[in-house]
């Protein structure tokens, strides 16, 4: 399982090494740090330092987790180095993956040029930390770590990262869940601490961690022991859980056309098989191969990492790298392009396989490596998954071995790929959205999708953006230009900007499709990429999907937004009106909205259509059969204007009365056939009914113009029931036990809508009576208007009449009057102030003084109701037609009430309440 492959100078690529497959690594995350090295004036130096960190299972017992970056969830993590051209993911022995791409590290967030001394090279800046934490961890936690990169030029980049790890109960492994990185790259001069190598050494310290520096430059090729170059110990606090163990091995080999020693014979890593009370990081330097290893040291146990000869070999093939020893079938041929500066080869995981070559080339290597890797300083927070602050002084050999990734001037697909990859890393959207910046990134994208890395990159992106957004943009632009040929790299750029913006927008509350529309600046690119901008994050995915839909279906989005916005705060009924009004407004804005408005207005129009004929009914007519029955029992007005005997008139009153009442309630369009006729003086119709009521009430000076009209000679005269006070009857609406209830309920049910339409009508019809009363009264509204007028007028105009005539007019008028008055209490206060004094107008049915209210129908002394003469034969067809019409209107009204569809259960409940209160039996 040990694979270490290193290419020659020409094929400078680092092969992932799988150290001791026993390591349990669920997945690896890669973060890249990017910052500009401003130390050299006139040159934008972006250096990337790669620090693979792998956390072992809770116990690194005799095994070191290997480094692998796999497109699939990596069992091991791999140290990846850029190759001159071509990118390939191939699993090594199924546990390690070899990744090579041109001019950039696999997941380098950005590529930059680093000119140090006289050599221009870029460090592959990759942080890889294994998501697997010690199995003992019990709870998810946020981990903060600081990464400090210090180069010889004293350019300092510090970032603070926070990663959240979620512990799965089954696997007992800590899995990083969308680690978020909040960091700011700070460039500053670091106090130079010269070490024996003459490099600047910065020792970032973190409580609870130990950092050990080992300089093995003095050691022979056989690193049997580690010489302590220097150690700074920070006592760690006891942790109930194991610290995720991490091992970093940096090995740099500078071959000269010969196979360089891959590594020394052995490396010792101290790890704890027990909960790590103290976490220590050892950085070992060796001039031999710049072999640097980082290991967690816990007081409990150390184990030696055996290195097998077959573990690694280096090859001098320029364009391809072949694993000569134990090549895995998956490995196949890995295309590796020569690095421009093939002097040094950086490899991870030492393997002593070529002792001979090492010995032979040891002098050469030492000579070439005049400056060994000074220090990799890693700070490990206790219990922190391998999120490490890293300090790397200038490493010329490493720079030499690494192909300058950041050189934008370098033309060719290498730079294109590099920029694409950097863009892909840069672009949060790319990882998060699973966008493949290029064919080279296909595997990367898959890998990223598999891992939880995207948020980190997004945060890194954010870090990078503040640092040098312009440089990145330039890179993005140039890379995109270079890569336009490749994999629609233009999409990448658009995504980089769009994704960021979209991501931010997505993260922002999606205020609706309009934003979503705005978000996808390049919807074509998004579609081409088959990448949903929001797919990066769950929340973002929804927003992005909305954005896509909005962009793809702006019309739908607009209509949906319209309907949604309309419907949100509105009830269906009010919402319908408001929606219709909004629609009318929005219809001006958009035809789609107009369509929506039309849809919504259609039901309204239907209502109106019904209303012109039936809508009044709908508003005023009782919405339940009980209410209708009560209305019938009380209102016995013939549609032709004659009052029919209570019993005989029930059906007609039901049809006529309810229809007329409804019509009165209904806005004039509904009333036009009836109300207009009535207002115009058609005695036989509702107005006649009103006149009939007004026979008593008209005598009482009906103020309403229509009511003021006296009923034609055949009309029934309404005799108002005697009430203790006008206030009481109106307050009670009780005089007609069925009708007041029904009327009240309809009035209450309908008053809101009728108020607007019927209020005008009722006002026009009954100026004395408030419109809301008519509106509110469903069935009795029409009679109620005259009645209210009667009651008001009689009280004012004919104080003597109101009681007796009303009692005479009795039940229809009284019922309507009571219902109207109850309704009027709320709306009618203007019309009848005294009547409105009634308590609790909000109580539709329950009137406090109802029990005190005389019930004339129970009194034998009630004046005989005026009997209407039978209609003539000539009037019979008209009456039948009116009855049919009223029935039809009632049916329609039953379908559509002022609040919309009839809520039968609610109406039934109200009917039951009314009946129970008044002693009715339903």
UniProtKB/Swiss-Prot annotation:
A Pfam short name: DUF4629
Compositionally biased region (Polar residues): 755-779, 790-824
Biased composition (Low complexity): 651-660
Biased composition annotated in UniProt, kind: Basic residues: 546-567
Matches recorded under InterPro entries: C2orf78-like, DUF4629
Coiled coil regions, renumbered to chain: 872-899
Feature: compositional bias, Basic and acidic residues: 582-600, 692-702
UniProt keywords, alphabetically: Coiled coil
Region (Disordered): 459-522, 539-627, 649-668, 692-835, 856-879
Keyword Coiled coil attached: yes
Keyword Coiled coil in record: yes
Name this protein carries in UniProt: Uncharacterized protein C2orf78
Gene label: C2orf78
């Amino acid at each position: 399982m040990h694979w270490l492959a290193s290419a020659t100078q020409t094929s400078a690529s680092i092969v992932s090494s799988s150290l001791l497959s026993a390591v349990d690594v669920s997945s690896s995350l890669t973060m890249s740090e990017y910052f500009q090295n401003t130390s050299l004036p006139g040159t934008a130096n972006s250096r990337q330092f790669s620090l693979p960190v792998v956390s072992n299972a809770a116990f690194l017992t005799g095994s070191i987790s290997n480094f692998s970056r796999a497109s699939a969830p990596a069992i091991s993590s791999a140290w990846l180095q850029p190759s001159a051209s071509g990118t390939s993911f191939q699993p090594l022995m199924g546990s390690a993956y070899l990744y090579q791409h041109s001019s950039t590290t696999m997941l380098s967030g950005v590529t930059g040029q680093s000119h140090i001394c006289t050599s221009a090279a870029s460090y592959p800046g990759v942080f890889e930390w294994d998501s697997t934490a010690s199995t003992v961890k019990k709870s998810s936690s946020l981990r903060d770590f600081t990464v400090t990169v210090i180069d010889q030029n004293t350019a300092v980049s510090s970032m603070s990262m926070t990663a959240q790890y979620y512990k799965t109960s089954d696997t007992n492994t800590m899995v990083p869940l969308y680690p978020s990185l909040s960091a700011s790259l700070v460039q500053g001069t670091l106090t130079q601490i010269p070490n024996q190598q003459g490099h600047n050494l910065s020792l970032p310290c973190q409580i609870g961690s130990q950092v050990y520096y080992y300089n093995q430059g003095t050691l022979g090729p056989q690193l049997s022991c580690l010489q302590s170059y220097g150690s700074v110990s920070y006592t760690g606090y006891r942790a109930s859980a194991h610290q995720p163990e991490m091992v970093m091995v940096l090995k740099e080999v500078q071959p000269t056309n010969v196979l360089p020693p891959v590594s020394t014979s052995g490396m010792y890593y101290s790890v704890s098989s027990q909960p790590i009370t103290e976490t220590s990081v050892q950085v070992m330097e060796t001039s031999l191969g710049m072999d640097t290893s980082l290991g967690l040291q816990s007081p409990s146990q150390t184990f030696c990492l055996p290195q097998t000869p077959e573990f690694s070999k280096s090859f001098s093939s320029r364009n391809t790298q072949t694993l000569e020893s134990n090549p895995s079938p998956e490995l196949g041929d890995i295309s590796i392009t020569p690095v421009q500066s093939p002097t040094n080869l950086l490899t991870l995981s030492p393997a002593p396989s070529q002792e001979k070559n090492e010995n032979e080339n040891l002098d050469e290597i030492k000579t070439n490596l005049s400056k060994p890797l000074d220090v990799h300083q890693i700070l490990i927070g206790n219990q922190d998954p391998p999120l490490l602050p890293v300090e790397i002084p200038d490493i010329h050999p490493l720079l030499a071995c690494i192909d300058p990734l950041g050189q934008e001037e370098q033309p060719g697909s290498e730079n294109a790929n590099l920029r694409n990859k950097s863009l892909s890393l840069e672009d949060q959207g790319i990882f998060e959205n699973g966008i493949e910046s290029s064919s080279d990134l296909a595997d990367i994208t898959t890998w990223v999708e598999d891992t939880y890395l995207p948020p980190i990159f997004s945060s890194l992106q954010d870090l990078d953006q503040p640092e040098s957004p312009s440089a990145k943009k330039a890179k993005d632009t140039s890379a995109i230009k270079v890569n336009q040929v490749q994999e629609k790299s233009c999409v990448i750029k658009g995504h980089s900007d769009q994704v960021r913006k979209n991501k931010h927008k997505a993260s922002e509350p999606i205020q609706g499709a309009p934003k979503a529309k705005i978000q996808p600046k390049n919807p074509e690119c998004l579609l081409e990429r088959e990448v949903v901008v929001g797919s990066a994050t769950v929340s973002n995915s929804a927003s992005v999907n909305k954005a896509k839909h909005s962009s793809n279906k702006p019309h739908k989005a607009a209509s949906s937004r319209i309907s949604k916005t309309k419907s949100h705060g509105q009830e269906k009924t009010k919402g319908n009106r408001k929606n219709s009004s909004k629609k009318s407004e929005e219809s001006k804005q958009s035809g789609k909205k107009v369509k929506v408005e039309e849809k919504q207005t259609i039901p309204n129009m239907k209502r109106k259509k019904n209303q012109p004929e039936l809508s009044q009914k709908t508003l005023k007519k009782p919405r339940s059969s009980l209410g209708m029955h009560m209305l019938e029992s009380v209102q016995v007005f013939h549609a032709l204007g004659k009052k029919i005997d209570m019993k005989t008139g029930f059906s007609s009153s039901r049809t006529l009365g309810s229809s007329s009442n409804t019509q009165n309630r209904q806005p004039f369009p509904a009333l036009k056939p009836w109300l207009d006729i009535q207002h115009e003086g058609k005695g036989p119709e509702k107005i006649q009914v009103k006149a009939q009521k007004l026979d008593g009430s008209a005598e009482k000076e009906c103020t309403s113009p229509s009511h003021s009209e006296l009923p034609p000679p055949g009309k029934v005269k309404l005799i108002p029931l005697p009430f203790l006070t006008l206030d009481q009857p109106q307050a009670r609406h009780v005089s007609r036990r069925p009708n007041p209830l029904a009327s009240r309920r309809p009035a209450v049910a309908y008053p809101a809508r009728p108020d607007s339409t019927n209020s005008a009508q009722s006002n026009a019809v009954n100026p004395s009576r408030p419109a809301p009363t008519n509106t509110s009264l469903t069935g009795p509204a029409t009679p109620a208007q005259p009645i209210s007028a009667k009651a008001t007028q009689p009280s004012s105009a004919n104080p003597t009449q109101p009681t007796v005539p009303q009692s005479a007019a009795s039940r229809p008028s009284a019922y309507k009057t009571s219902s109207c008055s109850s309704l009027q209490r709320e709306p009618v206060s203007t019309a009848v102030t005294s009547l409105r004094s009634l308590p609790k107008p909000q109580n539709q049915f329950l009137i406090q003084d109802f029990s005190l209210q005389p019930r004339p129908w129970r009194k034998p002394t009630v004046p005989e109701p005026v009997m209407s003469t039978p209609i003539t034969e000539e009037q019979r067809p008209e009456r039948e037609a009116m009855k049919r019409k009223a029935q039809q209107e009632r049916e329609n009204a039953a379908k559509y009430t002022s609040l919309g569809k009839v809520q039968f259960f609610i109406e039934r409940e109200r009917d039951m309440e009314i009946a129970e209160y008044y002693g009715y039996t339903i």
